Amino acid sequence: MKPACPDSECFSQNAGPNPRFQVRKKGYYYRRSDGQHVRRYQCTKCSRNFSSAALAPTYRQKKRHLNRWVLKHLCSGVSQRRTARLLGVNPKTVVRKFRFLADQARLKNLEYLKSIAPQSLTEVQWDDLETSEHTKCKPISVALAVDPYSRKVLGFRASRMPAKGTLSELSRRKYGPRKDERPKGWNQLLSELTPIVHPEAEWLTDQNPHYPQYLKRHFPRARHKTTPGGRGCIAGQGELRKKGHDPMFALNHTCAMLRADMNRLFRRTWCTTKTLEGLVQHLELYTWFRNQHLTPELEAGAG
């Protein structure tokens, strides 16, 4: 199918219901980056020449063939520097492609939420995963919502939080008071899920004392069930529980996979998150990769 003229000021945009009739084919050109022959077009109204590649998000990329490899490496526990070494490119190339892929993944994640039937989800699991930026004195909480049937990630929000326990005094002394942004993240996450979750859906969480008030604010008729947390089956990996039956297995298993497949979330690693924005971009990328490739193709909420 012929594309329409990309010029928004072209007269063909107002030439009836189908502006594609104002475009004609005009040969091909050879693209050296991936060895493809790309079709050229010409608009009969403004005489502008353009190609089918001009409408793609990878327009003018020189190494577009590396996009899928960067995606697979960064969602398989490989760091950005090691990805650059394995692919034989400059580390800055991997950083640029990481940011590009994260932007595309964010759009894909929004499309997935729109594809879910309105208020069709009757069960949701919700919990927080904790990590840090630069140092453990700067913790970050990632609120995560998962469909227990398909195990697809429905949404997340990463928020800064103050340090707890023995690190709290050291954190205040070195970096000053740290604002707790988790309430804002919880409100944003629940607000994002309002169109697709049934008002009387069953929400399963741990016994966090803060969850009920925020759940009541966005889903006043929802059924809220809690389950006590348990010890991790492996020291330092609290996501996988030691007890025999885990009611929140879908969410805990998702968190365990996040720690296994995202290098910056490893328990013992020097590839720590440097900025909150970088963590959010990586989570967007992995969420799309998981929902697309690592979870079964089931209808959301179908058990």
Where do the language-model regions lie?
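Residue-level recognition of single "structural anchor" positions
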Residues: 1-303
